[in-house]
A protein has these predicted regions:
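Tandem CBS (Cystathionine beta-synthase) repeat/Bateman regulatory domains
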Residues: 1-145
Length: 145
């Protein structure tokens, strides 16, 4: 399996796009960003450093189901602060194992002290599909001679 950095290089535009918010933002503002960007989680940054992650699950479980007001609740109050991170060199198979074991769908990618991207389960699934399509194509070519 390939390193995460290779997945980012294969993305449209060849980058590791990520969206971030501040712990001082309201949950309502965070949910707007999630919806506008079509992503399931945001990196939470404070003073240029990783402070946590906010996911749709955090919102659902810690705001919506508890009847809290998203315009009066702050990201810092519901974010996951103790975040599992990976490096750009982490292999995709290891990422799948981490996601499965921890029951998570997003992993911030950190190079040294710098957050360089966010890996999602969607990224991993798209990569598996692409690899399988390539394998099928190769097998078909071999069979046809």
């Amino acid at each position: 399996m390939k390193p995460v950095s290779e997945l980012f290089n294969n993305r449209a535009g060849g980058n590791a796009t990520m969206w971030s918010i501040s712990p001082d933002d309201t949950v309502f503002d965070a949910i707007k960003v999630l919806a506008e960007r079509g992503v399931g989680a945001l990196i939470v940054m404070k003073d240029g450093k990783l402070a946590g992650i906010l996911s749709e699950r955090d919102y659902t479980r810690k705001v919506a189901l508890l009847g809290k007001n998203s315009k009066e609740t702050y990201v810092r109050d519901i974010m996951t602060a103790n975040v599992m991170v990976i490096s750009p060199k982490t292999r995709t198979l290891e990422c799948m194992a981490i996601m499965s074991e921890k029951n998570i769908r997003h992993l911030p990618v950190v190079d040294g002290d710098t957050v360089v991207g966010m890996l999602s389960i969607r990224d991993l699934m798209n990569d598996i599909i692409k690899d399988h399509e390539f394998t099928i194509s190769q097998l078909e070519s071999y069979i046809k001679g």
